[in-house]
Every structure is written in C-alpha cells, then in structure tokens.
C-alpha cells in the first residue's frame, strides 16, 4: 500500500464528515474498521457509560492485549488510591554528626533518595508551554542548605544512597535496546535529571579533526570511546551505543566537517553514583572541600531495609503526588511511572520491588471488578512487551476511580485531545476535541487510547481502544483510533 505522510493522515482524520444521522454507534465504528489498515490488525474496544456501566460498544473487549503506555493508567491510579493525591517524596542529606566550629564534617555525607522523580529541571506542575530549567536545580538547593548549616570541609565521601528500594534497574520484558536511552533509564530511589544526560556530538571543523563530545549536566558518567571520523564529502552517520549496565559509551561513524551537533538523551548506568557526583560538584562549586570520593550505595534484592539514620542537614519535599502522576500521564514518562510503582509497593508492602508493585496493580484491578484472566502485567510504564490488559479491565479501572471519588482528579491528569501532552498533535479540526481526555500508548505494532469522552458527568463515557499486530504506518492506525474516539464522544452527546 502506498505510504502516507503523518500530516496527510491526520488531515484525513480531521476532515471526515460527521456521522450519518440515524446510524448507530456500531454502524459508525464498523465503517471506521472497514479501512484496509484496520482489517489487518487486532482490535479490542469497549465504551461504557461511567454513571451506570451501560455498554455502548464492544469488540473483543475481554481479550488481553499489549497495552503499551496505557499501563500507566493502572500504576498512577494505584499510587493515588494507596498513597493519596497529597503524598510527597522526601530527599534528605544526612551526616554522622553536625559540623564542628571550624565547619569540618567527620565521616560521610549521605544524599538519601526517597524516590522523588522531580530532582531535575522539569517544571512542576505540568505546563504544555514550560521550558525546562537547570537540570541540577533541586540538588543545588540542597547544596545551598548544607553550606548554610556551616559545612566547609567533609572528611569522608559523598554517598548517593538508593537503598530505599532494592536495586532492580529494569523490569521484566524491557528490550535491551531501550536501556541505552532516557526512556529506558534504570529505576532507582535516587534519581537526578531522570537518570539521563544530554549527549552532544559535534563533528570536527576540518578533515581529520576529532568530534567534540559534551554532556549536560556537565559531568562524566561514561568512559567515552570516540571513533567518529570527520571526512570531507562523507554522508553524515553518527552512532551511539552502550551495553546495558556498562559505563562505556561508544561513539562511531563518519561525518563531513562542520554542521550541527547530533543530540541524544542517554541513560546513565548507575543513577545513585551519578547523583553523588553531581552533588559533590555542586558542593565544590560552593567552596566545600571534600576529602573523599563520590560513591553509590545500593541494596541487593532480598536484603532487609532500615531507615538511614544521622543528623539531617537538608531536606527537600516533592510536589504532591497528583502533580507527579499528571506528568506521567501527560507526557508518558516511563521512569516516573516505575518510580511511583516502587514507592507504592514500599509503603504498602514494605518492599519496593517491581513484583510487589505489579501485585498491587493486580489487586487494584480486581477491586475495580476486572477479571484476573484478562490482565497480566510486568511493569508500571508499559515498556515491557510481556504486559497484557483487556479493554474491559481498563474501562473497569476508569469507572472505579469515579466510584472512589477520584474521577474528576484522574480525568484531569490525562492528555487533552488536540491540546496538550501526547495528544497535542491529534484530533485536529474536531471542534470539541477537548471533551476527550485519554492516555496514549505506543510500541512497535501496538497503539492504544483509553480514557473519558464527554464533559457532562451524567453522560460521560469511559472507553478503551487497543490495537495490536498492525503493519500499517503508526499515524494511520492512530488516526483510526481517534475517529473511533470521536464517534464515542458523539454518542455521549446524544
């Protein structure tokens, strides 16, 4: 089939004529699914009225399918239900004792991670127009407070303490290729700048000159093997590679002289070590002498946990959990979803493991009335290829949040169609698109869209659209899912 551009597909979706008068929702959705791209895919769809559960449309609604990032609906709902919307994550700086009269601190200075995903330049609360600030800004605030406590010399090490959760960096089912990049960053209770750095690779200005490599924040979390060649007349080809868990970053390829930098966001292998090095840098910039080194402290799976003790020199509380969940769902932030899940498991079960978190997700789905045979999850973000959810499970969850009195809040955390988050570029030309609030999901051959349609609470519809196994362009399949969502919205307005 002839490939279509993303723009043309979206324009096609926006310019469709309104539903024919008198046609049922079944007939209107059937017309959408008659498209060639739809026929070569597996669809799981359910639309139910939130108020009474009346089924408006269903197709393979109880078949477990790969949900991709629609999994985040479950992990964020779980955090809100178990921890509460006002829950805050705390990062502390501890020392064995207070500094002496000369400002000397004897022993190690410990930066204790509390699972806060906001130790970065990201703006909270979420704003679609916000520009990110200093990636080390929150750590700088902690460093300032340490200096205000009179610390001038540290005889020991700077320790990045990530022992709140066991060190299990990646959930089951994550692709090895994802682990190199920011969206597949390792999960740690001490996370700074989303455990990633901005890598900039700029070819030399003349034949034979080496490429310049820069990191932001300005740290050196990798041993760089740079074999990129600058060659006149060459076609630009710059490759970046890192084996999972390795601190060796390979930069290779060829590029003509000059030209702009190639930019990638690369995950760091040891988030707590990265945090310790960043904190040491900030303290030194403020004139603090550090006799020791920066190092990380982790807890092996199965090892017991005890709350770190010491004199608290500084602390930082995160914004409320609801605002963190908003970021997860609006921009589909994988690492943050996993962090919310681990912290929920830590608080509820006393073990911040992926498995304990997944078991809590299953418990919530069963509380919502979902059938156990219709879901099987492996992570909190949906990056795992092993996760399964049915459309019925997701709509049950969406209705359950309403029943718990969290419906309006949960709905507000989702992308607004045609306006923000991962739906900012979709539903163009639909006048009342903002009445659709939904979470997107995307993996290779997987598309998902689940959420709410309609502004009137009495007529609002919870829906889930899961698409698996397609070979058509992603934009074409998403446009079909969007058309179905619009038809569901129209039904809610009748």
Residue ranges and their predicted role:
Residues 7-17:
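Bacterial N-terminal signal peptides
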Residues 1-5:
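Positively charged n-region of N-terminal signal peptides that target proteins for export
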Residues 23-35, 81-373, 456-457, 479-483, ...:
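Conserved serine DD-peptidase/penicillin-binding transpeptidase domain
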Residues 53, 72-79, 158, 190, ...:
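Residue-level preference for non-acidic, small/hydrophobic
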Residues 58-78, 325:
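Short active-site loop at a secondary-structure junction
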């Amino acid at each position: 089939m002839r490939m279509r551009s993303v723009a043309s597909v979206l324009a096609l979706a926006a310019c469709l004529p309104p539903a024919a008068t008198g046609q049922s929702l079944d007939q209107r959705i059937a017309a959408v699914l008659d498209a060639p791209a739809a026929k070569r895919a597996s669809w799981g769809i359910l639309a139910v009225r939130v108020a009474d559960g009346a089924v408006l449309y269903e197709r393979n609604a109880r078949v477990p399918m790969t949900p991709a990032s629609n999994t985040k609906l479950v992990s964020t709902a779980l955090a809100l239900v178990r921890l509460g919307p006002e829950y805050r994550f705390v990062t502390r700086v501890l020392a064995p004792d207070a500094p002496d009269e000369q400002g000397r601190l004897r022993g190690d200075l410990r930066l204790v991670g509390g699972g806060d995903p906001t130790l970065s330049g990201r703006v909270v609360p979420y704003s679609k127009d916000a520009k990110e600030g200093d990636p080390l800004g929150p750590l700088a605030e902690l460093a300032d407070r340490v200096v205000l406590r009179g610390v001038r010399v540290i005889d020991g090490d700077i320790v990045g303490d990530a022992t709140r959760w066991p060190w299990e960096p990646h959930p089951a089912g994550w692709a090895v290729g994802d682990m190199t990049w920011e969206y597949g960053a390792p999960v740690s209770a001490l996370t700074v700048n989303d455990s990633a750095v901005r890598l900039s690779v700029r070819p030399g200005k003349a034949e034979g000159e080496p490429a310049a490599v820069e990191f932001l924040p300005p740290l050196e979390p990798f041993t760089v093997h740079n074999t990129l060649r600058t060659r006149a007349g060459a076609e630009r080809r710059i490759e970046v590679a890192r084996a999972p868990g390795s601190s060796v970053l390979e930069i290779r390829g060829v590029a003509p002289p000059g030209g702009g930098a190639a930019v990638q966001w690369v995950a760091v292998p040891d988030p707590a070590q990265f945090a310790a090095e960043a904190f040491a840098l900030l303290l030194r910039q403020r004139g603090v002498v550090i006799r020791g080194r920066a190092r990380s402290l982790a807890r092996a799976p199965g090892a017991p946990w005890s709350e770190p003790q010491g004199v608290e020199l500084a602390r930082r509380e995160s914004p409320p959990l609801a605002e963190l969940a908003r970021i997860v769902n609006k921009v589909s932030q994988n690492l943050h979803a996993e962090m919310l899940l681990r912290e929920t498991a830590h608080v509820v079960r006393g073990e911040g493991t992926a498995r304990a978190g997944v078991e809590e997700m299953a418990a919530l789905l069963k509380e919502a009335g979902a059938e156990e045979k219709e879901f099987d999850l492996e992570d909190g973000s949906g990056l795992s290829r092993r996760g399964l959810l049915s459309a019925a499970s997701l709509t049950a969850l969406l209705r359950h949040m309403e029943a718990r009195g969290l419906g309006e809040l949960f709905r507000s955390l989702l992308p607004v169609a045609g306006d923000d988050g991962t739906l900012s570029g979709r539903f163009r030309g639909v006048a009342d698109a903002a009445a659709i609030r939904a979470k997107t999901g995307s993996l290779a051959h997987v598309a998902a869209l689940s959420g709410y349609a309609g502004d009137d609470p009495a007529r609002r519809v919870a829906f889930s659209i899961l698409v698996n196994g397609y070979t058509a362009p992603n934009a074409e399949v998403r446009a079909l899912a969007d058309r179905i969502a619009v038809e569901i919205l129209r039904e809610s307005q009748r």
